[in-house]
Amino acid sequence: MPQAIHISPIDNVVVALHPIAKGTLVEVDGLSVTALEDIPQGHKMAVKPIRNGENVIKYGFPIGHATADAEPGTWMHTHNVHTNLSGEVEYSYNPAPDLAPLPKVAPEIFMGFRRKDGRAAIRNEIWIIPTVGCVNDIAKKMVADNQDLVTGSIEGLYTFTHPFGCSQTGHDQAQTRKLLAALVRHPNAAAVLVLHLGCENLQHDQFVEELGEYDHDRVKFLTCQDVDDEFAAARSILKELAAYAGQFQREPIPVSELVVGMKCGGSDGLSGITANPTIGRFSDMLGQRGGSTVLTEVPEMFGAEGFLMDRCINHDVFVKAEKMINGFKEYFISHNEVVYDNPSPGNKQGGITTLEDKSCGCVQKGGTAPIMDVIGYGDPVVTKGLNMLYGPGNDLVSATAMTAAGAHLILFSTGRGTPFSAPAPTLKISTNTPLAEKKSGWIDYNTGVIADGEKTIDETAQGLLDLVIRVASGEQTKAEKHGFREISIFKDGVVL
């Protein structure tokens, strides 16, 4: 079993794949270094002398600079490494020399649902979407009271509550309206009840305009203040929606029609070595089969955005990526926040030292394929292949944004563990085996076997593709079995 990994030949640190005790001789890539102190799993150890102010190199990239001299065998972490990041950067387009679509592969088949507009779906559910937080509990009671309608091919009746839709103005309200309308359009929702209170800022006419053309049999509206008994009214509407949703049956669909979101959270020092490269390889494999993937968490690209921007398929896509990256930095600066204050306490405990360290691991989820498009918050994926999406690092906000973009399911890597799920089925992928064993009720797939020396990234990626096909065909994720699913909306404005 390997003790550590030297990710790039030019790195001046290695990453401990397992805890390394002080005095242990570590041999990797022809290097022999004795640990001068205990090195926790996922943390970095110097393998070359690093002087005060010199860059610490991991993934072949500077992840910060040393704040004190360090000899080989020294633990390199927050006590002796600091970020190099500052504010906005002027980027230039330097396309990678090998920038080209990956060779195509015949797509496998999954058993999904074909909607009347031609789109594919992997779930056949009825959703209740409240437009304002005032009706949240009403929506929950409607779900509880109408579970008898979940029969035949209908796989669930759910609501996605939130505190917004009123006391918002301008761009902030428009962003909420856009996100909710995008959820209404999601193909996994066979039928949707949009639930209004009546007096909220987010008015019915505004929402219908935002929604655009829609199937009147698939989407129904109810304004609670307009009826004597909203529960009786909802019962009648939900019966109609159930009759509509029940006509869909699973049928063979090529995986080329899948849209898969990619996210990491509760990351550790192994995220960029095991789980995220596995997801990246999966992304390449799905792209080769004609499918689409979505990468977001813009603040967790800071410091590693060059890896992605040089892979933009053309200059127009590069310009959109540049605007997205610097636009998000300006969002931070406008709120008097530094752009590099990101790694959480859990990230640091797991071995992530700086935002560059976190970002270099995060972008591994993007694989090697060209970036085909950059889309805004609440916008749909319209281009096959790898897409970048405007969204924050926050787990639930970004997972909701990927769902709104049309992701059928989400791959979520974690080194610390998290139970949540977006409205789209959310597969939890552990970076290390101890987490998979400890939280077996949360984790769907373990890539810690890479660190254990049992499997290669190619093997775990193939296993992940097989699992995605099974989940797309109806196999439930751990979170689905627990009934976990929720949304969170990206708010950026005052509260009236």
Q: Where does each model-flagged region fall?
A:
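Metallocofactor- and cofactor-centric catalytic cores in central/energy metabolism, strongly enriched
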Residues: 1-409, 416-419, 424-496
